[in-house]
Amino acid sequence: MKHYELLFILKPTLTEDEAKVKVDFIKEVITKNGGEIASVIEMGTRKLAYKIDKYERGTYVVIYFMAPTQLIAELVRNVRITEEIIRFLTVKYENKREISAWDKLSKGQKLMPAKKELKAPEKPVEAE
C-alpha cells in the first residue's frame, strides 16, 4: 500500500457537527475501500489566500492514510461530489525520504529543516 495525504477545505458555514459528519464520510470512504487511516488533523477555520466560491474562510482538514492505488479514483470521485468541500489536494509519498516525512507528519511532529554546515571565517593572511 502507498502513503497518501488528503487535504481538503470545508465551507465555513458548516457547524462543527456538520463538519464532523463530512470528515467521517471521507474517512469511511477510505476505510471501506481498503485504506488505513494513520491520523486526522483538523486545523480549524482559517482565512483563504483568495476567495473560493464567494468564501473568504474555510475549515482545513488533513488526513494521512495508506491505501491501494485504485482507492484514489473512488476517493476523488466522492470528494468532488461532496458540495461542502470547496477545495482538495491529494499527495502521494513515494520514496523513503518522503515516507519518513509522512510518518513524522502523521504523528503530529514538525519537520526540521536540513542543517547547514557553517564554515568558520578564514583568517586573513598577513603579508610580511
Curated annotation (Swiss-Prot):
This is Small ribosomal subunit protein bS6. It holds the Pfam family Ribosomal_S6. PANTHER family: MITOCHONDRIAL 28S RIBOSOMAL PROTEIN S6 (PTHR21011), SMALL RIBOSOMAL SUBUNIT PROTEIN BS6M (PTHR21011:SF1). GO terms for cellular component: cytosolic small ribosomal subunit. One of its GO terms (molecular function) is small ribosomal subunit rRNA binding. InterPro entries: Ribosomal_bS6, Ribosomal_bS6_sf, Ribosomal_S6_plastid/chlpt, Transl_elong_EF1B/ribsomal_bS6. It comes from Campylobacter fetus subsp. fetus (strain 82-40). GO terms for biological process: translation. Belongs to the bacterial ribosomal protein bS6 family. Binds together with bS18 to 16S ribosomal RNA. The lineage of its organism: Bacteria, Pseudomonadati, Campylobacterota, Epsilonproteobacteria, Campylobacterales. Keywords: Ribonucleoprotein, Ribosomal protein, RNA-binding, rRNA-binding. The keyword Cytoplasm does not apply.
